[in-house]
Amino acid sequence: FAEDGWQPPSSLQFIAVGGALVSEMLILKARSLNLPVYQGYGLSEAASVVSLNAPTNDNIHSAGSVLPHIQTKIENGQLFIKGDLFLGYLNHQPHDKDQWYATGDLVEQRQNTLFIKGRLKNLIITSMGRNISAEWPESLLLSQSGILQAVVFGEGRPFLSAIIYADTKLSNPVLAQYINVINQQLPDYARIQKWHRLAAPLSVQQGLLTTNNRPKRDAISKQYHAVFEQFYRLGEVINE
């Protein structure tokens, strides 16, 4: 709506974004439209904010400063937290408040600031031995106007490929230009070499998204197995 001329009310002072890695480009674009967007990081088990940027303490590359009631440590790239957390999961043993909780998120911490890299389970290890968080190139793809869904693959493969759903108004040549722009921001090993454009979006009904619209990567990989095999056999860009 903001791109179409809608102006936010002057009373709107702060918009917190999170739930997935948000690219710097997307935040800058939102702010250029007078949307006061600040990235944070949290999880339900922490009820729920762990770190947050603010107008007086803002690092656009990061998920902000850790809040005072949370303790953090990093082990093998994974963030562990301790503090005022949840009591536990239903029908499971209570959570020990003195025990560190493994978040499953890959994070860098510099002083008191968190830099989110992605989910541990979404780490791609290529056949060249490169470790790449899928959310890294995905967040850049999704920062481009008209790219509505993007899921990156490449586990055990020599390069990365992507499944993309884009606005029907976006032509293939323009989409290719967008991907080229994104690739210039990535090192060679993390660039999208091949991509497949979907005719219809991934959906919960197809079993390809969770109920909160996160990609079910294994299901997507199986659904488009033939596409990926053709990518790595022939190196062609395919459109449905």
Across the structure, where does each feature detected by a protein language model lie?
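Gly/Ser/Thr-rich phosphate-binding loop
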Residues: 1-58, 148
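Conserved ANL (AMP-binding/adenylate-forming) active-site segment centered on the GW(Y/F)…HTG consensus within
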Residues: 10, 58-60, 84-111, 121, ...
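Conserved ATP/PPi-binding loop(s) of AMP-dependent carboxylate-activating enzymes
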Residues: 36, 65-68, 75-100, 113-114, ...
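Ser/Thr-glycine-rich phosphate-binding loops at phosphate-binding pockets of nucleotides
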Residues: 43-46, 102-103, 126-127, 210-212
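AMP-binding/adenylate-forming catalytic core of the ANL superfamily
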Residues: 83, 106-190, 194, 201
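Conserved C-terminal "lid"/linker of ANL adenylate-forming enzymes
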Residues: 124, 146-152, 181-240
